[in-house]
Amino acid sequence: MKDLIFLTYSEIKKRLNEGSLSSEELVSAYLERINAVDSKLKAFLELNQEKILKQAKESDDRRKNGKLLSEFDGIPIGIKDNICITGEVTSCSSKILENFVSPYDATVISKLKEKGFVLFPRLNMDEFAMGSSTENSAFQTSKNPFDSDRIPGGSSGGSAAAVAGSMLPISLGSDTGGSIRQPASLCGIWGLKPTYGRVSRYGLVAYASSLDQIGPFSNDMDGISDLLEILSGIDSKDQTTSKVNQFESKSVNEIDWKCKKIGIMKTEDFNFSPDVNARYLEILKTLEGKGAELVPLDFSLLKYAIPVYYLIATAECSSNLSRFDGIRYGLRKETSGKLDDLYSESRSAGFGKEVKRRILLGTFSLSSGYYDAYYGKAQKARVLIRKQYAEFFKTVDVILQPTSPTTAFKVGEKTKDPIQMYQADILTTSVNLAGVPAISCPAGLDQNGLPIGVQLTTSHFDENKLLGFAKSLSKLDICQISLPKEIK
């Protein structure tokens, strides 16, 4: 039974559908694993085992009676704590929403329920998705399964740790500036940020509405493509979803590297760790040997991505988080003073340090006299970044670069220097600003046994090509990673 937790998503799907494995048996194995290792990894904020097992038993009953909802019926999936599920606490790892029970399902949750997935809610995250390590969670810091003294990345660190720690085969996260891809890279798994507008954001608690996107983590490539097909599509409840052809998982095929133009970056322009730099160059050499044409691209605008991202994201967060005022829902601090005192006391007690920092920065950039100098300029720069990506894809088929400049750092190593923490997103934020899709793929281990990831990027709504390249990359010997069985 213990070996079940080390099956890939594809193997689980196959065995459930051929009848050699029951959902209850599988879910029980995962719950046993969670009980054994999550005291170290702290991926879950809460775990209602009775409710989870009930879902698994219902799936098995449907299977026995020939009433399966889909080929995915009975597969377990983890849910980040900022995605609403009816009757479940959705806290965003914040004190201000600690006791908020969602009255409705996010669109992505409705789609998963329609297919019969077994939901494992409440995976830890940085508070309101603001962070790159989960150290900004109001409740706990998640740990990296490859080394529990290190961070798993963020903000979707709990979602990544759950999959990398073999507590689940797949999970959902959200990506505003790299919050799926960076933890996927640091935890040695697959993580996709779809094109903005591909997946509905209805029911995702907003951080920065023009940047946020829900996406999947998986322990193999098929989990990514299957989940993208299930989650994508136009939604009347989210006017930013786009009318495009429905993505189909079965249409994803490996792509021959021969004569394909791969956009690459000059590593000397960025402060990569030696191991990340060496692995990136090694992969490029391997692809060149398979006939790919390497095309150096001018990433000069990338140096502006971090300031542009933090001006736009914090401005939107300042607006979005103004709804948490202690009146309608969330933490309420009773005062004997005026209404303004209630707002101030509730927000001061409910929000963490990093969230307050970003609200203040966003409010400042939107204020009279500074709007044009900061927010207005950032929006103009965003247009330039978007245009630069459009130019890139006129000459290359795909862009390949490291996902993160370094492997996972130790817990507490960067908490005193927020700027250093922000720089961890230098390779991911521009993708959100441009709205294009990108996937982080495992790319082997460094000298300390820590995962390295590389990021593939294609043009808007070209996920078929993106996942085709990712599938081909997954076959390279140099990119193989075995997830840890023992958590140390």
From Swiss-Prot:
Residues 136-145 have a biased composition (Polar residues). GO terms for molecular function: ATP binding; glutaminyl-tRNA synthase (glutamine-hydrolyzing) activity. Signal peptide: none annotated. Keywords: ATP-binding, Ligase, Nucleotide-binding, Protein biosynthesis. It catalyses: L-glutamyl-tRNA(Gln) + L-glutamine + ATP + H2O = L-glutaminyl-tRNA(Gln) + L-glutamate + ADP + phosphate + H(+). The active site is at K80 (charge relay system), S155 (charge relay system), S179 (acyl-ester intermediate). One of its GO terms (cellular component) is glutamyl-tRNA(Gln) amidotransferase complex. GO terms for biological process: translation. Residues 136-158 are annotated as: Disordered. Pfam families: Amidase. PROSITE patterns: AMIDASES. InterPro entries: Amidase (IPR000120), Amidase_CS (IPR020556), Amidase_dom (IPR023631), AS_sf (IPR036928), GatA (IPR004412). Heterotrimer of A, B and C subunits. Allows the formation of correctly charged Gln-tRNA(Gln) through the transamidation of misacylated Glu-tRNA(Gln) in organisms which lack glutaminyl-tRNA synthetase. The reaction takes place in the presence of glutamine and ATP through an activated gamma-phospho-Glu-tRNA(Gln). This is Glutamyl-tRNA(Gln) amidotransferase subunit A. It comes from Leptospira biflexa serovar Patoc (strain Patoc 1 / ATCC 23582 / Paris).
